[in-house]
A protein has these predicted regions:
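Long, structured protein-protein interaction/assembly regions in large complexes
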Residues: 3-223
C-alpha cells in the first residue's frame, strides 16, 4: 500500500522541472544547471551521468556507450586515483570467469599477453587470496595495470548479468559449473573496452561502439 501511495503522488522530473532541479543543485548557476539537465535528458532514465575534471577551461558533456554495474573496489591497493578513490583503466582487456581462479598459473598466459601488449586488465571474477596478493604486488611494483572486481548481480541474477557483460565487451565467460575448464582461459576469450572506472560502489565500463550483438541483446531485454 505504501508503494501504491508513493506511486500515486510521484512527480516525473522532466523538461523545465529538470532544468530547475539541476540549477538548484548547482547553487542557482543557470548555465551549469542547463548543462547537467541536458546530460540527463540525453542519456534517459536508464542512463548514468558522471562528473569529471575537465582537461580544458570548458565545461561540456560527452555521451559514451557503456554500462554501470554494482561492483566496487575490492582492495585499496588497486586504486589509481587516490583523490577520488577510484581505479581507472584505459583501454583495458577484460577477463570474465564465473568460477574462482585458484592460482596465478591459470591466468599466466593472459597476464603475459597484457604486459607484452602494454594494455591494462580488468578481471571480473572471484579470485583466491593468493591470486589477489600476487596481482596487487605486481600492480604496486608497476609491472602490470590491473583491477579486480566481483561478478555482477546477486544470486540467481549473477549468471544472466555476467552474460550481458560478456556480450557488451566481447568476452567469453569461463564457468566450471557449465562444464568449462579453467585451463581454457586464454587470450582468445578476452573482451575489451575503452575505459573502466571503479569506485567504492560501482564500475562503469565505456565502449568505443555498440556491436550488433549488444543491440540484439538490448532488443531482447526490452521485449
Amino acid at each position: 500500500k505504501i508503494n501504491d501511495y508513493l506511486e500515486s503522488i510521484k512527480i516525473n522530473v522532466k523538461d523545465d522541472l529538470l532544468d530547475n532541479v539541476a540549477t538548484i543543485s548547482c547553487n542557482n548557476d543557470v548555465k551549469l544547471g542547463k548543462i547537467i539537465s541536458e546530460a540527463y535528458k540525453s542519456v534517459g532514465k536508464d542512463g548514468v551521468v558522471l562528473m569529471e575534471e575537465s582537461e580544458t577551461d570548458e565545461t561540456y558533456t560527452e555521451i559514451v556507450d557503456g554500462v554501470q554495474i554494482e561492483c566496487g573496489i575490492t582492495s585499496p591497493h588497486l586504486i589509481t586515483d587516490t583523490d577520488k578513490q577510484r581505479a581507472v583503466l584505459e583501454n583495458p582487456l577484460i577477463l570474465i570467469v564465473a568460477s574462482e581462479i585458484p592460482n596465478v598459473r591459470k591466468i599466466q598466459n593472459v597476464l603475459e599477453h597484457v604486459i607484452k601488449q602494454n594494455r591494462s586488465l580488468l578481471i571480473v571474477a572471484p579470485v583466491s587470496q593468493q591470486v589477489k596478493a600476487a596481482l596487487i604486488m605486481n600492480k604496486v611494483k608497476g609491472n602490470i595495470k590491473v583491477n579486480i572486481i566481483d561478478l555482477p548481480g546477486f544470486g540467481p541474477t549473477t549468471q544472466e548479468t555476467t552474460k550481458d557483460l560478456a556480450i557488451l565487451t566481447g568476452a567469453t565467460v569461463i564457468n566450471e559449473e557449465l562444464g568449462d575448464d579453467l585451463d581454457a582461459i586464454s587470450i582468445d576469450i578476452l573482451g575489451e573496452a575503452e575505459k573502466a572506472v571503479t569506485d567504492t560502489k560501482n564500475t562503469v565500463i565505456t565502449l568505443d561502439d555498440i556491436t550488433q550483438d549488444v543491440e540484439d541483446r538490448i532488443d531482447e531485454v526490452i521485449k
